[in-house]
Regions:
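Metal-dependent nuclease catalytic regions and adjoining charged, substrate-binding loops involved
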Residues: 4-5, 142, 174-282, 288
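Mg2+/Mn2+-dependent nuclease catalytic core
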Residues: 112-115, 119-215
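Short acidic (Asp/Glu) and glycine-rich catalytic loops that position anionic groups and cofactors
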Residues: 19-26, 43-46, 75-76, 148-152, ...
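A non-catalytic, helix-rich entry segment at domain boundaries
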Residues: 45-117, 285-286, 293, 297-298
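Heptad-repeat coiled-coil alpha-helices
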Residues: 275, 282-284, 289, 305, ...
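Alpha-helical coiled-coil heptad-repeat register
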Residues: 263-277, 293, 300-303, 307, ...
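Nuclease catalytic cores
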Residues: 11, 15-24, 28-54, 93, ...
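C-terminal, charged and often intrinsically disordered regions of DNA end-processing helicases
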Residues: 1-36, 108, 265, 273-275, ...
């Protein structure tokens, strides 16, 4: 059973419980894509932009921040071999710079100072622990809180905008709980087509999203109790990384239950090792302690073997996903 829920995880379960299981329980990693790498780098550049003095926040400086961010990001293992050629990487970079040009055309970064950037938000609603990171929080000219999120993709039509605010509503709910102040507005900045969507916050809307996320949480708990995470066929299936191993589309889809069991056992062993590490002398443990019968060397050896088995299983599944 997971201990925390983020807005993105909640949305994922709502969209498709099977996808949620593949990603968060079976822990089948989705490789970083060029689109995701671009989003990460653009977000980093926009965050760093506000480290500069207002009169230095121009397009040229923002482009340089993008290049600096990518130099750091590309060294990560997950971005290794992301591009097949230098030319492909160059085109990718030029597209990233275009997104930043679009940002500069719809918002003037010299005219305000963000209240906070990349802010950790966490809190509890009944038995649910929620946490996540919001891109930016401002105060408008009325002194009211505004929560801002950057999107590197394209904005939907205005009449379809509200579902996209689900995560920001949750952040607003947690901010209200933490600070005792309700944000007045949510803002989504879509960089692909230079569009800003806003939504006024009301107490009714926060009460409603609280009901909605608790319903999702209760459904997650039921899914864990019954071990049933059904696949939900929808319009997003064609873009789902896990489609090749989804039983809806593949009658011979591999059973990932063993992965789930190994992951759960790895978590248990890790917790036991961490508990034993707290004691300099194991002999100090009382005889009736569950830890007294454990051998840390045996636990570490078992962990390594299970981790290798898990990696081999995931590798075979990843081969199917790449076909």
């Amino acid at each position: 059973m997971i201990k925390n829920l983020s807005p993105s995880r909640a949305s994922q379960f709502k969209t498709c419980p099977k996808q949620f299981k593949f990603a968060n329980i079976d822990k089948i990693k989705e490789p970083t894509t060029e689109v995701q790498a671009k989003g990460t780098t653009v977000h980093q550049a926009l965050e760093n932009l506000f480290d500069l003095k207002p009169d230095e926040r121009n397009t040229e400086k923002l482009h340089n921040l993008f290049r600096e961010a990518w130099t750091k990001v590309r060294g990560n293992d997950e971005h290794h071999n992301l591009f097949s050629s230098v030319e492909e990487e160059r085109e990718w970079g030029l597209d990233g710079l275009k997104l930043l040009n679009n940002y500069m055309s719809i918002e003037d970064p010299t005219s305000f100072e963000p209240l906070e950037r990349e802010r950790w938000v966490r809190g509890s609603i009944e038995d649910l622990n929620l946490r996540g990171i919001l891109d930016r929080m401002d105060r408008n000219n009325k002194g009211e809180l505004v929560i801002v999120d950057y999107k590197s993709g394209k904005a939907p039509l205005a009449k379809y905008k509200e579902p996209r605010f689900f995560a920001l509503k949750l952040y607003a709910l947690l901010i209200q709980k933490e600070l005792g102040e309700m944000p007045s507005e949510l803002k989504l900045i879509y960089l692909k087509n230079s569009t800003i969507h806003t939504l006024k916050v009301t107490q009714d809307s926060l009460d409603q999203v609280k009901i909605e996320v608790l319903e999702i949480w209760n459904n997650i708990k039921k899914a864990f109790e019954t071990n049933e995470f059904p696949a939900t066929k929808n319009t997003l299936c064609d873009w789902c990384y896990y489609k090749p191993i989804c039983p809806v589309f593949n009658e011979n889809a591999p059973d990932t239950e063993k992965l789930k069991e190994i992951n759960e056992e790895l978590i248990d062993i890790k917790e036991q090792i961490e508990a034993l590490d707290m004691f300099e002398n194991i002999d100090e443990l009382p005889d009736n302690s569950e830890l007294a019968s454990l051998n840390i060397n045996e636990l570490e050896e078992k962990y390594q073997k299970l981790d290798i088995e898990r990696a081999e299983m995931e590798d075979s599944i990843q081969k199917l996903l790449r076909e």
